[in-house]
């Protein structure tokens, strides 16, 4: 948020923000609200593909505003500028790293909001010639640290638990680490833990969590640059840009 504010300020714009809590109805309301108060342009950050509804697309078109989307998936048919995070390549990097470290029974834990990453995880495992054990795919309603803790406890209750767990984001990885420590297990000797997003806190937990780092600062800089150009030149060609994440190896693998 602070970076977005700084990038916009450098272009002579102020930031008005509305949180949507990853809910489709809240996102739709945000689009309609911003349209009513006559903002100059819209930067829409979407975390789940389920939010990309026909109703939302219609609302964005009706607004008549220059719009930049930041998504986790490529939408080639949309008529808006878009930057998408190449989560596919990031998750493949993560699975490859765990495989190279010798881990074979790799679990994946997620909440219901991050299911797109679970789908990519399964694809990455198959691409690497590794078996996807349905018992090792744990998805539940709880989010963040509590979700990571509870899903890891479920994995530990299995007769044949995993030797590594891929967490769909870093907060879940923090919860997973707590569950493993509570059970007296060593990280990464007994079980490795990998996160996703590279939150600031991830470098301070358990000597540092191995994670996939999304280029958020570059993403915001490019998004603001394109969006502010669009406000001055509405007829410029549509921009579709993919940014790749990086693997950050730390202590938990």
Each model region followed by its residue ranges:
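An alpha-beta-alpha
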Residues: 92-128, 135, 239-252
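Short beta-strand elements in bilobed, periplasmic/extracellular small-molecule ligand-binding domains
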Residues: 8-20, 107-108, 122-146
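Flexible loop/turn connectors
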Residues: 151-253
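Short helix-capping segments at alpha-helix termini
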Residues: 8-11, 63, 126-132, 157-161, ...
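Periplasmic-binding protein-like
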Residues: 38-47, 66-68, 107-110, 138, ...
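Hydrophobic alpha-helical segments within soluble ligand-binding/sensing domains
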Residues: 81-108, 119, 123, 145-154, ...
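Short beta-strand/turn micro-motifs composed of small residues
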Residues: 19, 46, 71, 84, ...
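Alpha-helical recognition/docking segments in bacterial nutrient-uptake
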Residues: 1-96, 100
């Amino acid at each position: 948020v602070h970076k977005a504010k700084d990038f916009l300020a450098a272009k002579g714009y102020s930031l008005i923000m509305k949180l949507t809590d990853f809910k489709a109805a809240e996102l739709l309301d945000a689009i309609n609200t911003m349209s009513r108060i006559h903002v100059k342009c819209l930067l829409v950050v979407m975390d789940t593909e389920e939010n990309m509804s026909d109703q939302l697309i219609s609302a964005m078109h009706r607004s008549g505003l220059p719009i930049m989307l930041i998504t986790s998936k490529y939408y080639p048919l949309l008529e808006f500028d878009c930057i998408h995070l190449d989560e596919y390549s990031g998750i493949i990097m993560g699975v490859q790293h765990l495989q190279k470290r010798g881990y074979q029974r790799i679990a994946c834990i997620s909440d219901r909001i991050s299911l797109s990453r679970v789908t990519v995880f399964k694809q990455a495992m198959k691409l690497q010639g590794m078996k996807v054990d349905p018992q090792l795919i744990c998805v539940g309603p709880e989010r963040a640290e509590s979700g990571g803790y509870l899903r890891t406890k479920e994995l530990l209750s299995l007769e044949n638990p995993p030797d590594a767990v891929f967490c769909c984001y870093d907060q879940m990885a923090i919860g997973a680490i707590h569950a493993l420590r509570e059970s007296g297990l060593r990280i990464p000797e007994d079980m490795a833990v990998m996160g996703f997003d590279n939150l600031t806190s991830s470098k301070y937990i358990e000597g540092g969590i191995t994670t996939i780092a999304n280029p958020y600062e570059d993403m915001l800089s490019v998004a603001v640059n394109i969006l502010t150009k669009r406000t001055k030149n509405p007829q410029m060609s549509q921009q579709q840009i993919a940014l790749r994440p990086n693997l950050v190896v730390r202590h938990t693998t």
